[in-house]
């Protein structure tokens, strides 16, 4: 999982503490993130994954549901939730955004999480 590796490598490089959970699929990330937030144990949640377009309209519905769900959770709980779900037209585009030797978005998700935690701590 290249996105996860990019994210955890960056957090490890900064000596940050984190916990990794796995979820069944993109749609389930919304309720899973909500449950993580409800534990009140974490300063931030980074949701990582990929939704790749297929031949049906399902892609559009999943993208919309997950995007709306995650943004609603973040606003409702006043907790940073980093939207680390790639939404691409094909696997090649997803790989380009996840490859460690290129612009690994996982690293960017970790950087954003650390920035937001720091910003919230200043409030």
Label every model-predicted segment.
Residues 21-39, 86, 91:
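Glycine-rich oxoanion-binding loops at beta->alpha junctions
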Residues 28-70:
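Glycine-rich phosphate-binding loop
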Residues 60-87:
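Short, acidic/small-residue loops that bind anionic groups at enzyme active sites
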Residues 89-103:
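Phosphate-binding/catalytic loops
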Residues 103-123:
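A charged, well-structured terminal subsegment
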Residues 1-24:
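Glycine-rich phosphate/diphosphate-binding loop of Rossmann-like nucleotide-binding domains
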């Amino acid at each position: 999982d290249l996105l996860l590796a990019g994210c955890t490598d960056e957090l490890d490089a900064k000596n940050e503490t984190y916990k990794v959970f796995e979820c069944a699929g993109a749609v389930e990330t919304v309720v899973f993130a909500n449950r993580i937030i409800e534990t009140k144990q974490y300063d931030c949640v980074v949701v990582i994954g990929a939704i790749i377009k297929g031949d049906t309209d399902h892609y559009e519905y999943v993208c919309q549901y997950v995007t709306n769900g995650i943004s609603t959770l973040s606003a409702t709980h006043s907790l940073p939730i980093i939207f680390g779900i790639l939404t691409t037209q094909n696997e090649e585009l997803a790989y380009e955004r996840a490859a460690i030797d290129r612009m690994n978005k996982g690293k960017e998700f970790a950087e954003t999480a650390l920035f937001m935690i720091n910003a919230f701590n200043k409030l």
